[in-house]
Protein backbone atom coordinates (compact mmCIF):
# COMPACT_ATOMS: atom_id res chain seq x y z
CA UNK A 1 0.00 0.00 0.00
CA UNK A 2 1.11 3.53 -0.71
CA UNK A 3 1.21 6.08 2.08
CA UNK A 4 -2.08 7.60 0.90
CA UNK A 5 -3.71 4.19 0.60
CA UNK A 6 -2.55 3.23 4.07
CA UNK A 7 -4.19 6.37 5.45
CA UNK A 8 -7.54 5.58 3.84
CA UNK A 9 -7.52 1.80 4.16
CA UNK A 10 -8.71 1.66 7.82
CA UNK A 11 -11.47 4.14 7.06
CA UNK A 12 -12.62 2.23 3.97
CA UNK A 13 -12.45 -1.08 5.83
CA UNK A 14 -14.52 0.33 8.70
CA UNK A 15 -17.06 1.82 6.28
CA UNK A 16 -17.49 -1.51 4.48
CA UNK A 17 -17.91 -3.26 7.82
CA UNK A 18 -20.59 -0.78 8.94
CA UNK A 19 -22.47 -1.14 5.65
CA UNK A 20 -22.24 -4.93 5.97
CA UNK A 21 -23.69 -4.78 9.50
CA UNK A 22 -26.51 -2.42 8.45
CA UNK A 23 -27.53 -4.66 5.55
CA UNK A 24 -27.30 -7.76 7.74
CA UNK A 25 -29.52 -6.13 10.39
CA UNK A 26 -32.05 -5.00 7.77
CA UNK A 27 -32.25 -8.53 6.36
CA UNK A 28 -32.65 -10.04 9.85
CA UNK A 29 -35.49 -7.60 10.61
CA UNK A 30 -37.22 -8.50 7.35
CA UNK A 31 -36.78 -12.21 8.02
CA UNK A 32 -38.28 -11.80 11.48
CA UNK A 33 -41.31 -10.07 10.01
CA UNK A 34 -41.72 -12.71 7.28
CA UNK A 35 -41.47 -15.68 9.65
CA UNK A 36 -43.80 -14.01 12.13
CA UNK A 37 -46.37 -13.41 9.41
CA UNK A 38 -46.09 -16.67 7.44
CA UNK A 39 -44.66 -19.17 9.91
CA UNK A 40 -41.69 -21.40 9.20
CA UNK A 41 -43.07 -24.03 6.83
CA UNK A 42 -44.75 -21.78 4.28
CA UNK A 43 -42.18 -19.26 3.02
CA UNK A 44 -39.68 -20.56 0.49
CA UNK A 45 -36.24 -18.98 0.22
CA UNK A 46 -37.31 -17.04 -2.93
CA UNK A 47 -40.30 -15.68 -0.97
CA UNK A 48 -37.97 -14.69 1.86
CA UNK A 49 -35.69 -12.99 -0.67
CA UNK A 50 -38.67 -10.94 -1.87
CA UNK A 51 -39.65 -10.08 1.71
CA UNK A 52 -36.10 -8.86 2.36
CA UNK A 53 -35.97 -6.91 -0.91
CA UNK A 54 -32.52 -8.26 -1.78
CA UNK A 55 -31.15 -10.61 -4.40
CA UNK A 56 -30.92 -14.31 -3.69
CA UNK A 57 -27.15 -13.99 -3.82
CA UNK A 58 -27.18 -11.24 -1.18
CA UNK A 59 -29.54 -13.19 1.05
CA UNK A 60 -27.31 -16.28 0.89
CA UNK A 61 -24.19 -14.14 1.40
CA UNK A 62 -25.46 -13.12 4.82
CA UNK A 63 -27.44 -16.25 5.72
CA UNK A 64 -26.39 -19.36 3.74
CA UNK A 65 -29.40 -21.57 4.60
CA UNK A 66 -33.05 -21.28 5.59
CA UNK A 67 -32.09 -22.46 9.07
CA UNK A 68 -29.49 -19.67 9.33
CA UNK A 69 -32.21 -17.24 8.26
CA UNK A 70 -34.47 -18.54 11.04
CA UNK A 71 -31.70 -18.15 13.62
CA UNK A 72 -31.06 -14.58 12.43
CA UNK A 73 -34.77 -13.80 12.73
CA UNK A 74 -34.91 -15.31 16.23
CA UNK A 75 -31.84 -13.41 17.40
CA UNK A 76 -33.18 -10.15 16.00
CA UNK A 77 -36.55 -10.75 17.65
CA UNK A 78 -34.86 -11.60 20.95
CA UNK A 79 -33.17 -8.19 21.09
CA UNK A 80 -36.36 -6.43 20.08
CA UNK A 81 -38.38 -8.35 22.66
CA UNK A 82 -36.09 -7.59 25.58
CA UNK A 83 -36.00 -3.90 24.66
CA UNK A 84 -39.79 -3.90 24.38
CA UNK A 85 -40.23 -5.52 27.81
CA UNK A 86 -37.87 -3.06 29.48
CA UNK A 87 -39.35 0.07 27.93
CA UNK A 88 -40.52 2.38 30.75
CA UNK A 89 -40.02 -0.36 33.35
CA UNK A 90 -39.94 0.60 37.03
CA UNK A 91 -36.65 -0.08 38.83
CA UNK A 92 -37.38 -3.50 40.35
CA UNK A 93 -39.66 -5.63 42.50
CA UNK A 94 -43.36 -6.40 42.12
CA UNK A 95 -44.20 -3.29 40.02
CA UNK A 96 -41.49 -4.26 37.54
CA UNK A 97 -42.74 -7.84 37.26
CA UNK A 98 -46.30 -6.59 36.69
CA UNK A 99 -44.94 -4.22 34.06
CA UNK A 100 -43.17 -7.10 32.28
CA UNK A 101 -46.40 -9.08 32.10
CA UNK A 102 -48.36 -6.06 30.86
CA UNK A 103 -45.71 -5.54 28.20
CA UNK A 104 -45.93 -9.25 27.33
CA UNK A 105 -49.66 -8.84 26.73
CA UNK A 106 -48.97 -5.80 24.53
CA UNK A 107 -46.34 -7.82 22.61
CA UNK A 108 -48.72 -10.72 22.06
CA UNK A 109 -51.43 -8.38 20.76
CA UNK A 110 -49.16 -6.47 18.44
CA UNK A 111 -46.36 -8.81 17.38
CA UNK A 112 -47.26 -12.40 18.29
CA UNK A 113 -50.98 -13.13 17.90
CA UNK A 114 -50.09 -16.67 16.75
CA UNK A 115 -47.99 -17.42 19.81
CA UNK A 116 -44.31 -17.42 20.65
CA UNK A 117 -42.17 -17.33 17.52
CA UNK A 118 -39.34 -19.18 19.28
CA UNK A 119 -41.56 -22.08 20.27
CA UNK A 120 -43.06 -22.15 16.77
CA UNK A 121 -39.54 -22.34 15.30
CA UNK A 122 -38.65 -25.16 17.65
CA UNK A 123 -41.81 -27.04 16.68
CA UNK A 124 -41.01 -26.63 12.98
CA UNK A 125 -37.32 -27.61 13.33
CA UNK A 126 -37.04 -29.80 16.46
CA UNK A 127 -33.81 -31.49 15.35
CA UNK A 128 -31.90 -28.37 14.27
CA UNK A 129 -29.15 -27.63 16.80
CA UNK A 130 -28.69 -23.96 15.82
CA UNK A 131 -32.40 -23.21 16.16
CA UNK A 132 -32.55 -25.18 19.42
CA UNK A 133 -29.62 -23.18 20.78
CA UNK A 134 -31.11 -19.83 19.74
CA UNK A 135 -34.42 -20.69 21.42
CA UNK A 136 -32.72 -21.96 24.56
CA UNK A 137 -30.55 -18.82 24.85
CA UNK A 138 -33.63 -16.63 24.39
CA UNK A 139 -35.65 -18.47 27.02
CA UNK A 140 -32.80 -18.51 29.54
CA UNK A 141 -32.24 -14.78 29.01
CA UNK A 142 -35.94 -14.10 29.64
CA UNK A 143 -35.76 -16.19 32.82
CA UNK A 144 -32.65 -14.30 33.92
CA UNK A 145 -34.39 -10.99 33.25
CA UNK A 146 -37.24 -12.09 35.53
CA UNK A 147 -34.72 -12.85 38.29
CA UNK A 148 -32.84 -9.60 37.82
CA UNK A 149 -35.88 -7.34 37.80
CA UNK A 150 -37.93 -9.15 40.44
CA UNK A 151 -34.88 -9.56 42.68
CA UNK A 152 -36.35 -12.96 43.55
CA UNK A 153 -34.07 -15.83 42.57
CA UNK A 154 -36.38 -18.15 44.52
CA UNK A 155 -39.27 -17.34 42.13
CA UNK A 156 -37.28 -17.43 38.89
CA UNK A 157 -38.74 -20.65 37.53
CA UNK A 158 -42.27 -19.85 38.68
CA UNK A 159 -42.20 -16.40 37.06
CA UNK A 160 -40.71 -17.87 33.91
CA UNK A 161 -43.43 -20.55 33.75
CA UNK A 162 -46.12 -17.88 34.13
CA UNK A 163 -44.49 -15.95 31.28
CA UNK A 164 -44.34 -19.05 29.07
CA UNK A 165 -47.86 -20.12 29.97
CA UNK A 166 -49.23 -16.72 29.03
CA UNK A 167 -47.39 -16.58 25.72
CA UNK A 168 -48.48 -20.11 24.79
CA UNK A 169 -52.10 -19.68 25.89
CA UNK A 170 -52.48 -16.30 24.17
CA UNK A 171 -53.60 -17.60 20.73
CA UNK A 172 -56.46 -19.51 22.40
CA UNK A 173 -57.43 -17.37 25.40
CA UNK A 174 -56.26 -13.86 24.52
CA UNK A 175 -56.71 -11.36 27.35
CA UNK A 176 -58.12 -14.04 29.67
CA UNK A 177 -54.65 -15.64 29.73
CA UNK A 178 -53.14 -12.32 30.81
CA UNK A 179 -55.82 -11.70 33.46
CA UNK A 180 -55.24 -15.14 34.97
CA UNK A 181 -51.45 -14.76 34.91
CA UNK A 182 -51.71 -11.31 36.49
CA UNK A 183 -53.97 -12.62 39.27
CA UNK A 184 -51.60 -15.54 39.94
CA UNK A 185 -48.62 -13.20 39.87
CA UNK A 186 -50.16 -10.81 42.42
CA UNK A 187 -51.01 -13.70 44.74
CA UNK A 188 -47.55 -15.19 44.34
CA UNK A 189 -45.74 -11.93 45.06
CA UNK A 190 -48.03 -11.11 48.02
CA UNK A 191 -47.66 -14.62 49.45
CA UNK A 192 -43.88 -14.56 49.15
CA UNK A 193 -43.47 -11.05 50.59
CA UNK A 194 -45.03 -12.02 53.92
What are these regions (language model features)?
Residues 104, 118, 122, 159, ...:
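Short alpha-helical scaffolding segments that buttress acidic/His motifs in well-ordered protein cores
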Residues 1-22, 194:
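N-terminal intrinsically disordered/low-complexity leader segments
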Residues 26, 30-68, 72:
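Helix-turn-helix
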Residues 72, 86-111:
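Hydrophobic alpha-helical connector segments
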Residues 131-136, 140, 149-194:
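Hydrophobic/aromatic-rich alpha-helical bundle segments in the mid-to-C-terminal region
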Residues 108-130:
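Amphipathic alpha-helical segments used for helix-helix packing
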Residues 75-81:
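Short, basic, alpha-helical segments at the C-terminal edge of helix-turn-helix-like DNA-binding modules
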Amino acid sequence: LTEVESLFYPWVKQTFYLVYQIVKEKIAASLEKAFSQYGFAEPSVPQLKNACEVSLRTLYKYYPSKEAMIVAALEHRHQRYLSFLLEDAPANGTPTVLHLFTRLEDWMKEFAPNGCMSINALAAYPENLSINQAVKQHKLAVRQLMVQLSQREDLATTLFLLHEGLSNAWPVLGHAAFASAEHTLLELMKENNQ
